[in-house]
């Protein structure tokens, strides 16, 4: 007992300490306040008087609330100020009762109304809207407060759509329906496509969704109240309303849409049209052509064809169809398209990518004959004008792509100044359906350079000079490692895909064994000996085939000539152009007295030499040496040689300065003289450096060249 007393005294002491620690106006907790929710609102003057609450517009007491605190003027505040006594205007009936022995939930839990008007729910009757999943039902909103917002989402079963009918509509009217309104959307949310927005009191027509859901939104603004609205909904199918006329069968598809299967004699989306027995009159064939039924049911009789018949048209000989190739007999008894005609025309000739064509504007051509001159002298000018020959009319009608009208002229030119045209520059479409003249083509201009070379001119570029590189198969004495490329010879470009070179450059030493094409490449547009100084404009081309002359002798180096076929076409430019091939008629008997230009790179140059970086393509003049004299020169040096008919010897011309040593550079030999294609001088390939025993470049021994002229036909056969 003593222990219990001391415990109670301890609790009282603790309570006094807690009270002394609170702020002044909250120092006393009024235990009479009904629950902790009220304590924060209660002052020391908290009263127990009951405050009566009334429903809006009514005088009878419908509820009470306590306590109510006094304000600064020591007056009891109105119950409407405190949220515990605010009763929503739309309550259908308010909760009755007084503060009794038990705690009423009138204020504390927020339940103010016992019953709400239809469509509203919640303790304050302010909540509305819901998700509806039913085959049928209703949406009823009895009256509505200010600033209300309600949403309903109606879901139907898959394969069904929703029909919504308004039984009553009483909202504030506005032409734009922007104050109080009901908005219906075709979907399940407020972002779905809107069907329509309604206001006022005029009931709308029934509304149908396209899918299985419908969204209904109600909104009211801050003024005026009306009676609300009432709508019923039900699940239906697109066929529920029997949309097909004349006993047509309504068929549903997977999307919920419908199609009507019409009975015989009816047509239309809903079988609403009576199908008349129609047909099309027979189409005649075009002049200089004929027709053929290619699809559909075909002829009804000799003069008519059935609906759905397709007729195709064709032309005879050199005539071309202008207009629709096919026409179809349509449901209305009319033919599709327009009747075509057969016209004389020419198919455009095929041209290469190097040829540019231009169709000239249509002009009717006429010719003056002796008869015209006779009339001009025998008759007066007036009579001549009256009796003048009428010029034919210009052709009409569109032609298929790739055809041109009669008398059309087409002009041709090469796409680049580095090419020259062969064939006609202008061709005319004749009445026979053929083109006048010869088909044009463009070939590269050969043997032309920007400036005439001279031994005194430094830096002359020879655009047909081809550098032949070979890939190493082992360690080279010069420090080249396996797989590195090194310059072995010079060749001559003779067309976009062909290079002529000495055969010993592309075979194993002393053998007729051809090296692999993968171990060979051709570089065009090269000028400097050092590969690092080459311009970006050079072209590195792969080799697709190596054609060795069948009579090549690897011991005597007789017939020392080969053709390289390029895998990729050379791009013709100022730096890359072919050289011409000379004919027997071009080379006169004065060939022995000719001054021949030889060009090539120093293939034996030392890469460590100070001048290697600036070393360029060398060239110089040589003169032809008599074959017997050439053999005697070598015999005097103890070197027996044979100069065959496929060779010629030449040595440096002492009368002209030169920087070339043919024994070190190899290279190609060329002559400049007017060719058959142009009176201007053109450079022609006449020889390839084959062999030389002049180790010191002292000109004591002549260099042997392979003659190109005897192999011209063989080269041209392999150029194709």
Swiss-Prot record:
May play a role in regeneration of skeletal muscle. It comes from Mus musculus (Mouse). This is Inactive serine protease PAMR1. It is found in: Secreted. The keyword Secreted applies. Disulfide bonds join 128-150, 177-199, 239-250, 244-260, 262-271, 280-329, 315-342, 414-442, 489-505, 630-649, 661-697. The lineage of its organism: Eukaryota, Metazoa, Chordata, Craniata, Vertebrata. Residues 235-272 form the EGF-like domain. The keyword Cell inner membrane does not apply. Induction: Down-regulated in dystrophin-mutant mdx muscle cell line. Glycans are attached at residue 614. It comes from the Eukaryota. Predominantly expressed in normal skeletal muscle and brain. Expression is enhanced in the regenerating area of injured skeletal muscle in mice. InterPro entries: CUB_dom, EGF-like_Ca-bd_dom, EGF-like_dom, Peptidase_S1_PA, Peptidase_S1_PA_chymotrypsin, Peptidase_S1A, Serine_Protease_S1-Domain, Sperma_CUB_dom_sf.
């Amino acid at each position: 007992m003593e222990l219990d007393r001391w415990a109670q005294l301890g609790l009282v002491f603790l309570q006094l300490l807690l009270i002394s620690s609170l702020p002044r106006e909250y120092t006393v907790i009024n235990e009479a306040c009904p629950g902790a929710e009220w304590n924060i609102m209660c002052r020391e003057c908290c009263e127990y008087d009951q405050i009566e609450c009334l429903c809006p517009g009514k005088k009878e007491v419908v509820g009470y609330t306590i306590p109510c605190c006094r304000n600064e003027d020591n007056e009891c505040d109105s119950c409407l100020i405190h949220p515990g006594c605010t009763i929503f205007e739309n309550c259908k009936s308010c909760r009755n009762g007084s503060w009794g022995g038990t705690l009423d939930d009138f204020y504390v839990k927020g339940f103010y109304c016992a019953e709400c008007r239809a469509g509203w729910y919640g303790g304050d009757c302010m909540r509305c809207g819901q998700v509806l999943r039913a085959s049928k039902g209703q949406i009823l909103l009895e009256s509505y407060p200010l600033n209300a917002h309600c949403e309903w989402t109606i879901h139907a079963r898959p394969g069904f759509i929703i029909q919504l009918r308004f039984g009553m509509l009483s909202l504030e009217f506005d032409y734009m329906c922007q104050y109080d309104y009901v908005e219906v959307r075709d979907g399940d949310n407020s972002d779905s496509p809107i069907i329509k927005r309604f206001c006022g009191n005029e009931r709308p027509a029934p509304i149908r969704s396209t899918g299985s859901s419908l969204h209904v939104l109600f909104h009211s603004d801050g003024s005026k109240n009306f009676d609300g609205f009432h709508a019923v909904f039900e699940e239906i199918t697109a066929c529920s309303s029997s949309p097909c006329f004349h006993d047509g069968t309504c068929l549903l598809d997977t999307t919920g849409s419908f199609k009507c299967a019409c009975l015989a004699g009816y047509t239309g989306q809903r079988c609403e049209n009576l199908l008349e027995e129609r047909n099309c009159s027979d189409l005649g064939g075009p002049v200089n052509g004929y027709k053929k039924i290619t699809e559909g049911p075909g002829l009804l009789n000799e003069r008519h064809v059935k609906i759905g018949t397709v007729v195709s048209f064709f032309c005879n000989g050199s005539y071309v169809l202008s207009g629709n190739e096919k026409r179809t007999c349509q449901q209305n008894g009319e033919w599709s398209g327009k009747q075509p005609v057969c016209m004389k025309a020419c198919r455009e000739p095929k041209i290469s990518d190097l040829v540019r064509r231009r169709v000239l504007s249509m002009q009717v051509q006429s010719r003056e004959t002796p008869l015209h001159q006779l009339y001009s002298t025998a008759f007066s000018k007036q009579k001549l004008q009256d009796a003048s020959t009428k010029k034919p009319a210009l052709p009409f009608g569109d032609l298929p792509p790739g055809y041109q009208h009669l008398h059309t002229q087409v002009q041709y030119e090469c796409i680049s100044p580095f090419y020259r045209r062969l064939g006609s520059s202008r061709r005319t479409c004749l009445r026979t359906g053929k083109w006048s003249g010869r088909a044009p083509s463009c070939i590269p201009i050969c043997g032309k350079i920007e400036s005439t070379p001279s031994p005194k001119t430094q830096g002359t570029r020879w655009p047909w000079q081809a550098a032949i590189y070979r890939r190493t198969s082992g360690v080279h004495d010069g420090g080249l490692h396996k797989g590195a490329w090194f310059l072995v010879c010079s060749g001559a470009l003779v067309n976009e895909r062909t290079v002529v070179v000495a055969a010993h450059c592309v075979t194993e030493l002393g053998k007729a064994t051809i090296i692999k094409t993968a171990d060979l490449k051709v570089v065009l547009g090269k000028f400097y000996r050092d590969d690092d100084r080459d311009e970006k404009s050079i072209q590195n081309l792969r080799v697709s085939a190596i054609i060795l002359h069948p009579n090549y002798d690897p011991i005597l180096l007789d017939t020392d000539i080969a053709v390289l076929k390029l895998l990729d076409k050379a791009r013709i430019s100022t730096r890359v152009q072919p050289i011409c091939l000379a004919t027997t008629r071009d080379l006169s008997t004065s060939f022995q007295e000719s001054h021949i230009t030889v060009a090539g790179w120093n293939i034996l140059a030392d890469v460590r030499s100070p001048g290697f970086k600036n070393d360029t393509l060398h060239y110089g003049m040589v003169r032809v040496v008599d074959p017997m004299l050439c053999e005697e020169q070598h015999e005097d040096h103890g070197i027996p040689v044979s100069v065959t008919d496929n060779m010629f010897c030449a040595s440096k011309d002492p009368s002209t300065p030169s920087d070339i040593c043919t024994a070190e550079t190899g290279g190609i030999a060329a002559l400049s003289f007017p060719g058959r294609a142009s009176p201007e001088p053109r450079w022609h390939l006449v020889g390839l450096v084959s062999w030389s025993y002049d180790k010191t470049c002292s000109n004591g021994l002549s260099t042997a060249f392979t003659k190109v002229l005897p192999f011209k036909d063989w080269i041209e056969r392999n150029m194709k």
